[in-house]
């Protein structure tokens, strides 16, 4: 078992720091989280780095501050690289870090609705049946739960008229979710048990992606972003409390 992969608090903590603009020294807290994640498991480091890179590009290019963008990259990468070096990340050749599995250990397009894609094929729902998927997709387990799924559909009904404005206002989060989802799906995309896309990547792309061969794990930040923003939107829209009670009961 990969016990270190249970440190999902790193993802939640990073999202909290990113969302809460009232926190002082947010950038340095992010640096600490990303650097510390390298001491736990590199998959968390890769996820947080990717999210941080997109957020940083968006914020700094929005303000047209290229100098600050480069400064942030430097201040992040120096402690991260030094930490990784000190614990032995670079003690083996890069070629030895490449692995088999990218395109196999991935997520399914229906992962958020599939209650039985996890370890041991346990069904985590009393209401939804198993959705057939392909071999290796247990790594991309991201079942949201019936309650959250219903909540998301309720929210879509409430915000459909202003959806374009909401996307524009929170575009950086939509970009992050889309990019993470593409990585999680890999180059072999399945919809349930149906494989709809399967192609070979050129070696210059496959080589670095094979380092994160279990790309399905990149569904985790999306999972938490969807839950956090669904609950936040529920509160902001002042939806009747009885809906929330019902959602909690069936979650």
Protein language model regions, located:
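Periplasmic/ER-lumenal interhelical loops and adjacent helix-loop junctions
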Residues: 83-158
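Perimembrane helix-loop-helix junctions
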Residues: 18, 46-78, 155-166
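Hydrophobic alpha-helical membrane-interfacial segments at the cytosolic entry of transmembrane helices
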Residues: 64-88, 99-104, 108, 172-179
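Membrane-interface helix-loop junctions at the exits of transmembrane helices
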Residues: 1, 84-93, 115-124, 174-213, ...
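Hydrophobic, aromatic-rich transmembrane alpha-helices
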Residues: 145-167, 178-182, 230
């Amino acid at each position: 078992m990969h016990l270190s992969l249970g440190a999902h608090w790193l993802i939640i903590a990073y999202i909290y720091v990113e969302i809460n603009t009232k926190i002082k020294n947010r950038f340095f807290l992010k640096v600490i989280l990303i650097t510390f994640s390298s001491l736990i498991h590199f998959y968390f480091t890769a996820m947080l780095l990717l999210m941080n890179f997109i957020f940083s590009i968006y914020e700094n290019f929005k303000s047209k501050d290229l100098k600050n963008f480069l400064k942030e990259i430097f201040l992040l990468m120096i402690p991260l690289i030094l930490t990784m070096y000190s614990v032995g990340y670079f003690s083996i050749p890069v070629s030895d870090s490449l692995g088999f599995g990218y395109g196999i250990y991935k997520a399914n397009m229906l992962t958020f609705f599939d209650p039985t894609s996890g370890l041991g094929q346990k069904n985590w729902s009393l209401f939804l049946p198993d959705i057939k998927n392909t071999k290796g997709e247990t790594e991309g387990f991201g079942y949201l739960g019936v309650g959250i799924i219903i909540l998301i559909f309720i929210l879509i009904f409430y915000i459909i008229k202003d959806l374009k404005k909401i996307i524009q206002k929170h575009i950086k989060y939509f970009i992050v979710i889309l990019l993470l989802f593409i990585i999680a799906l890999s180059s072999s995309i399945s919809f349930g048990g149906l494989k709809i896309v399967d192609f070979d990547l050129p070696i210059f792309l496959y080589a670095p992606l094979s380092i994160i061969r279990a790309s399905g794990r990149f569904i985790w930040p999306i999972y938490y972003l969807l839950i956090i923003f669904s609950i936040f939107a529920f509160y902001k829209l002042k939806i009747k409390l009885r809906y929330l009670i019902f959602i909690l009961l069936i979650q």
